[in-house]
């Protein structure tokens, strides 16, 4: 018997249920550079102290179970357990607390977002002692980051591939999202790209349905891309959605896209799953394909303020798993997104190093070391009048995506694309000349519309369209 085993055996085993806080609440713990740190918004059940609730989260998401077990004596719990090391009340909320938990790195498989989430946001979210639980943020240590490939290419490589610099990229989701034949779909793609857009996009639920099988769509879209490139002299792309029912089918679609020579494919990373997404990201890097990521299903997870997981965590997970673009909200359009919160996770997607900033919802300083950045995509209910605000909010390293705001133009798809391109170029020029886009935006668009009948028509159509609802998820 080894000395270590003798020591553990001599302690003895006492069956029964213990308070979690006796083992997992460690306020004196000093976090390590290699720890994964998590900030949970905890709402305990009545009568459950916050220390016990925070310790329960640490236990149930690491080594703990509901009772003492004799096999605890066969390992070093002190080495492997999660620790709740700090608890603070949430300002303005009754019986809500932020519980900070540190996890030792050895709890997680290298290069696996799937395994990381299975532990941290697994069974613990159904724990009866908690009325609600939300993961607000994660600090991923550099030692763990270095086990991931991350985005297939990143922002700079994408710009070099496209030969487009100094402005946001322009996109459009083809509408109606379902029901078009492959040929009519390809026609809409061609008209939008010819009109001046950089990208067009499959909607998230376009996969391979009876009205339009994936192979037919890929072929007609490739034809549209090459025709538009020949006529405009610009590199164009269409986000061909490779999402499928199996990983094998997904990769088959990506292989066909590569054989067609198109620059980019797409994946629904939450409905498709992180294992599938990471596999596709590896294929895309190895084969020179950019990867656009749609976040369909995110609001099921992140929209409620007291339960689920904040999108900033999903954004960090996507950067680890791999994607060159990801939808991030618009601040000004029809979909959820408060400005400071949105800009907080936009920086987490793009920048190499992000300081802790609670005013933007960032709970931890995050160093991404050499992991490439991800372009945020603003999409959903936006049109030409939003262009100055979008340019000012998101800056050059972004994709501005107008679906209805392109295809809803009264003169057709190509004029809709022209209107958006003229509006963007006018905003970029005005910004470069030192004008204030936030204050002078409408005037800049009106001036540009004098020289572009397409833009003037778009301005008239959408002059009264607004989406003025308060965001559900706001800063505390």
Curated annotation (Swiss-Prot):
Membrane spanning stretches: none
Residue numbers of N6-carboxylysine PTMs: 201
Residues annotated to bind Mg(2+): 201, 203-204
Molecular function terms from GO: magnesium ion binding; monooxygenase activity; ribulose-bisphosphate carboxylase activity
Domain of life of the organism encoding this protein: Eukaryota
Location(s), subcellular: Plastid, Chloroplast
InterPro entries: RuBisCO (IPR033966), RuBisCo_large_chain_AS (IPR020878), RuBisCO_lsu_C (IPR000685), RuBisCO_lsu_C_sf (IPR036376), RuBisCO_lsu_fd_N (IPR017443), RuBisCO_lsu_N_sf (IPR036422), RuBisCO_lsuI (IPR020888)
Gene Ontology BP annotations: photorespiration; reductive pentose-phosphate cycle
Annotated site, Transition state stabilizer, chain positions: 334
One cellular component term from this protein's GO annotations in UniProt: chloroplast
Active site: 175 (proton acceptor), 294 (proton acceptor)
Function in brief: RuBisCO catalyzes two reactions: the carboxylation of D-ribulose 1,5-bisphosphate, the primary event in carbon dioxide fixation, as well as the oxidative fragmentation of the pentose substrate in the photorespiration process. Both reactions occur simultaneously and in competition at the same active site.
Family statement drawn from the similarity comment of this UniProt entry: Belongs to the RuBisCO large chain family. Type I subfamily.
Miscellaneous field: The basic functional RuBisCO is composed of a large chain homodimer in a 'head-to-tail' conformation. In form I RuBisCO this homodimer is arranged in a barrel-like tetramer with the small subunits forming a tetrameric 'cap' on each end of the 'barrel'.
Subunit structure: Heterohexadecamer of 8 large chains and 8 small chains; disulfide-linked. The disulfide link is formed within the large subunit homodimers.
Entry protein name: Ribulose bisphosphate carboxylase large chain
Species of the source: Phaseolus vulgaris (Kidney bean)
Gene encoding the protein: rbcL
């Amino acid at each position: 018997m080894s000395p270590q085993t003798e020591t553990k055996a001599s302690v003895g085993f006492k069956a029964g249920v213990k308070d979690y806080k006796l083992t997992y609440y460690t306020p004196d713990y000093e976090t390590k550079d290699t720890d994964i740190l998590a900030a949970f918004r905890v709402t305990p059940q009545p009568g459950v102290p916050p220390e016990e609730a925070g310790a329960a989260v640490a236990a149930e998401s690491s080594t703990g179970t509901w009772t003492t077990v004799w096999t605890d004596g066969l390992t070093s719990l002190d080495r492997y357990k999660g620790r709740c090391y700090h608890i603070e009340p949430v300002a303005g909320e009754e019986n809500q607390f932020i519980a900070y938990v540190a996890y030792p790195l050895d709890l997680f498989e290298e290069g696996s977002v799937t395994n990381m989430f299975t532990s941290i946001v697994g069974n613990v979210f159904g724990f009866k002692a908690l009325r609600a639980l939300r993961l607000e943020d994660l600090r991923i240590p550099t030692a763990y980051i270095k086990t991931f490939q991350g985005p297939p290419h990143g922002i700079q490589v994408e710009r070099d591939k496209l030969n487009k610099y100094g402005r946001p990229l322009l996109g459009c989701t083809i509408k109606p999202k379902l029901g078009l034949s492959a040929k009519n779909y390809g026609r809409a793609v061609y008209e939008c790209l010819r009109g001046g857009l950089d990208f067009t996009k499959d909607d998230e639920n376009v996969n391979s349905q009876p009205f339009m099988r994936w192979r037919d769509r890929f072929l007609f879209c490739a034809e549209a891309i090459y025709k538009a490139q020949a006529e405009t002299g610009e590199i164009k792309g269409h986000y061909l959605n490779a999402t499928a029912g199996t990983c094998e089918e997904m990769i088959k679609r990506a292989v066909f896209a590569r054989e067609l020579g198109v620059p980019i494919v797409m994946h629904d990373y939450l409905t498709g799953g992180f294992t599938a997404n990471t596999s596709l990201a590896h294929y895309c890097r190895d084969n020179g394909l950019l990867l656009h990521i749609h976040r369909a299903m995110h609001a099921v997870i992140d929209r409620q303020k007291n339960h689920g997981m904040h999108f900033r965590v999903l954004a960090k997970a996507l950067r680890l798993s791999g994607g060159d673009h990801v939808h991030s909200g618009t601040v000004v359009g029809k979909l959820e997104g408060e400005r400071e919160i949105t800009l907080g996770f936009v920086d987490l997607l793009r920048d190499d190093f992000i300081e802790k900033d609670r005013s933007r919802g960032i709970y931890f300083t995050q160093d991404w070391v050499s992991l490439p950045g991800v372009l945020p995509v603003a999409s959903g209910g936006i049109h030409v009048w939003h262009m100055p605000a979008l340019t000012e909010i998101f800056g050059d390293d972004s994709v501005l995506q107008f679906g209805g705001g392109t295809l809803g133009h009264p003169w057709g798809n190509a004029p809709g694309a022209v209107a958006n391109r003229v509006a963007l170029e006018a905003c970029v020029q005005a910004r470069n000349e030192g004008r204030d886009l936030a204050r002078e935006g409408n005037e800049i668009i009106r001036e540009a519309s004098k020289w572009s009948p397409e833009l003037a028509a778009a301005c008239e159509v959408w002059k009264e369209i607004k989406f003025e609802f308060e965001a559900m998820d706001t800063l505390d």
